[in-house]
């Protein structure tokens, strides 16, 4: 499932629901994929999904995150895709421990990657560096406060 995410600068991005994993008894963790997407108008997301669905095969980050904003309607479902992730093996135990057994503040991290928030917004200025997936690094647009 691809959903639109409003950003603090008035633009939009998209994230994908990759999986639902049992975290502990009665508690489930939604695994989300994050992408290098920033657009002005939500209608552009429809075109992006239709014309370049392969963009959703290589997230720069995955993490566990709640779905409250989806339930409240803040995030809109754009499409349902059968995604074959090319850079993530959801059965990899080390990825599970590092990336999706942990609930993270995903949208602020997305905004840091997109250059909307400062890269060093958290206490650990290298926090985001440590959780980017293999093959991804700090983008040139990153800035510091």
Where are these regions (language model features)?
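Intrinsically disordered, low-complexity coil segments
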Residues: 6, 22-27
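Beta-strand-rich cores of mature extracytoplasmic or soluble domains
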Residues: 47-145
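Short coil-to-beta transition motif at edge beta-strands of beta-rich domains
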Residues: 1-7
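Short beta-strand-centered aromatic/proline hotspots
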Residues: 11-21
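Residue-level signal for short segments within beta-strands and strand-turn junctions
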Residues: 7, 19, 34-36
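Short solvent-exposed strand/turn elements
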Residues: 25-51
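Conserved beta-strand and immediately adjacent loop positions that scaffold enzyme active sites
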Residues: 2, 14, 31
